Amino acid sequence: MRGKDAHQGDIFMISLDPTVGSEIRGTRPVLVLSNKDFNQGGRALVAPITQGGNFERVAGWAVTLMGSGTATQGAVVVSQCRVLDLAARAAKKLEAVPDDLLDDCLAKLEAITAH
């Protein structure tokens, strides 16, 4: 899988390791938040999807997949997004999320980065 083939709203299975501290770790699904122009560089801005993330859920930095119609379950933890080389990490595409769910995630990212 080439990183430039990733589309905003795609879900991939990928290893997030190595990590440090309280970063979400392990092999898990991630949601691509970056647009196709950014992804052309071979990397993508992604947010991990987890069954945990209780702090982020309470704080409002996570978006649940419940009721979205996706096979992937859990919550997109926007507060832990990072840029990854999808090809180097052998990412496997699983599915894509509906536009309204992607919009919710992008709104959370905007809230995090607003000044």
Go through each PLM region and give its residues.
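Conserved functional hotspots at enzyme active or ligand-binding sites that engage polyanionic ligands
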Residues: 1-115
